[in-house]
Swiss-Prot record:
Gene3D superfamilies: Bira Bifunctional Protein, Domain 2, Nucleic acid-binding proteins
InterPro entries found in the cross-reference section: Aa-tRNA-synt_II, aa-tRNA-synth_II, aa-tRNA-synth_II/BPL/LPL, Lys-tRNA-ligase_II, Lys-tRNA-ligase_II_N, Lys-tRNA-synth_II_C, NA-bd_OB-fold, NA-bd_OB_tRNA
Sites where the protein binds Mg(2+) 1: 400, 407
Listed PANTHER family: LYSINE--TRNA LIGASE, CHLOROPLASTIC_MITOCHONDRIAL, LYSYL-TRNA SYNTHETASE
GO-annotated biological processes: lysyl-tRNA aminoacylation
Name of the protein this chain belongs to: Lysine--tRNA ligase
Gene Ontology MF, one: lysine-tRNA ligase activity
Amino acid sequence: MSDRLNDQAQHRLQKLLRLKQTNNDPYLVTKTSLTHSSKSFQVEFEKCSEEELKKKATVSLAGRIIAIRQTFLIIQDFDGQVQLYINKKIHPKLFDYFNEFVDIGDQIVVSGKPMLTKTKVLTLAVEEMKIIAKCLLVPPEKWHGLTDIETRARKRFLDLTYNLAMRDVFLKRTKIIKSIRSFLDQNGFIEVETPTLQAVLGGANAKPFKTHYNALKADFYLRIANEIALKKLIIGGFNKVYEMGKMFRNEGVDTTHNPEFTSIEIYQAYADFEVMLVLVEKLIQSLCESLNQFSFNWNNKTINLKTPFHKITMVELIKKVTGIDFNSVKDDQSAILLAEKHHVKLAKHQQNKQHIINLFFEQFCEQTLIEPTFVTHYPKAVSPLAKQDPSNPEFTQRFELFINGKEIANAYSELNDPLEQRKRFEQQLEEKQLGNDETSELDESFLEALSFGMVNTAGLGIGIDRLVMLLCECNSIRDVVFFPQLREHK
């Protein structure tokens, strides 16, 4: 490591070596006794007079040094910051220790008495100090000015130290996730766990990560969704279940996509997609109430999350945006001609009306959905696990919630006819032969379970990372994930 250290870092390393030589090795510390955090220190002493502070007992604190100005220091712990003062005349040995060994970035434990400076700033007058972790590398001087998202994500440990606004985002994320669980628990849902490794790919249309299970001598997938397992629980007699966890899709990375992401899927027996539409509205309202905020700025757009949200069918939306009424398009060939006219590229498996409707929506309509909008009744060809609409069998009882052009939630009345489900799986296999590498596999285990009978059921999936982006007003998914995957740093 030393060959790569610059001069300042070499100087820090020499200080560490001297600490060890003088029986002050910071890494031998195993217990740290503290009386206060920065927050409790401020709360207890901020309203005290100088005379009252003189009567207070000794206080011990710990934190990272983020600033040094002569004999004043600022340390920061999880809750905030505290100013320290070293009186050279009263504590000459302490000052010598500070002067010889201490650098910005070091983790220290201190004890002393609270005091007020001449400018009435609450400060700890240090009587004892010990370095408990030496910072060997030079920390950034102006981290707040850093705008390179990749650098911040790659060195999240520094980002969290010197950018407290980023720390607040992750605390808010934790609060949001707790609130989601609390809402569902209060509404009678049971949290469950299902396998991350899956023998059969299914539950969504996406490219998977593949691995090999040595003990079983078989290839497995990291799950792209947990839908199939959760529906098996409904078949097994559970009425309301949900699971929050990691999903994995071997696809692109951008400001709203991360191959490893957090999702929640929710299933309710004896319900349809309209029930889930109401549920997701109530859930988002509950989150806004817990945050005491209903208006959010996301990617320079003001988003109002007060319900009810807008609602429109996919075909109606396409007509509204493009003027094209797909209800009047009678066959695949007519749809193909429309696609050619409007420069919509078609893959081999997309040479039909249903896929073309979905492509028109994705290409021309998604980005127009700024205010929260439920887009309903997706084509059956792109919804292999959704129940068809009895009034129009080309379409399904499905919706997706869009906010600022981004999909936030996806829900549908679950297909529970095992014969129809087998047919849909077979159609997916046909598409795979035509080059669609995002299709589901034929899952005999699921078909067997479905054949024992699944009552009418509704399912809902929500992308937690995107929802947190919105509620924390972050423009990149990397800003709401502690350690997003990045290309190898060269």
